[in-house]
Amino acid sequence: MLLNDGGRRFWLAGLGDQLAHWLGPSYFQGVDDLPGTLERITTDDPVILLAHEPDIFTAVPPRVALTLAGHTHGGQIVLPFMPQLWTPSEYGARFAYGHIVEQGRHMIVSGGLGCSKVPLRLGVPPEIVRVTLGA
């Protein structure tokens, strides 16, 4: 959807869940369609992409100015005296939390509020992230 904020236009695009349907041990089928979503963007205005899981970031083209994601809950289990124990991501701690910049592409991964897969959250305070957009 093309939005206009005081004369500054930008696209807000969203993806379906990448892990929507469980098909067996360690295998999910998603309902995300990155190519189809980006195909609907018809101008050169900046794009903000909303994605539940941050793992899609490796496929996001430079055309997208910012990707916003969650799902990892900041690593979910983080102890100060040990390396990160578990993160619900194919990439481990790489996309667990924060502002990530890779090859000029930007993604913010929120720690969120709950937990994922394992009903436990330690060392990662819940959060709601507010993003202020500017020129």
Regions found by a protein language model. Give the residues of each.
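Soluble catalytic domains of enzymes that build or remodel membrane lipids, polysaccharides, and related
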Residues: M1-A135
